[in-house]
Amino acid sequence: MKIDEIKLLYGYNDWADARILAACARVSPEQYAAPDSYGRGGLRATMIHILDNLWQQRITLQGYYQEPLADEAAYDATELHEDAIPTFAGLRERWMTEQREMRAYIDALTDETLNGTIRYVIPGLVREHVVWHILLDVIIHATQHRSEAAALLTAYGQSPGDFELTMFMNERASGKS
């Protein structure tokens, strides 16, 4: 993988995130917070899950989990939860921060570090992965859960539209994104 390729994919991911966030902004606070059996348990829960994965993978890549944390509770304490981000405004603010932080991380990579490995520890396991594999997994994970959020939003009459890479590329080529 090359830096320009991962930057293109993160450009797409940010574009798709903007579409889903714009649709979330159009639902009522009650719809946003409503529990549901679909996705991760509702729109807010699903969106926080996407954000948590972006956050967790970024801090993993930056070395936060190089050594084991004290216990399972210490790992749980690093996760983002609905009670900490109860409103859509809070989610959007944190999302923008995480996108900036991830972009800064990616901008500091070289082709060599992108293709290098990272070792990290999660409860009871030591893992090692290629950096770009983790970065790509963030995008794939977000794609899955954005589609779940999109289904919920569509049920509320607020479809975010399509998330196709070719749409992003066409908009980018025309200067719209």
Name what the model sees in each region.
Residues 7-22, 26-78, 121-177:
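Short, contiguous alpha-helical
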Residues 79-120, 128-152:
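Acidic/histidine-rich alpha-helical segments that form the ligand environment
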Residues 1:
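An N-terminal RHG(E/S)-centered segment typical of histidine phosphatases
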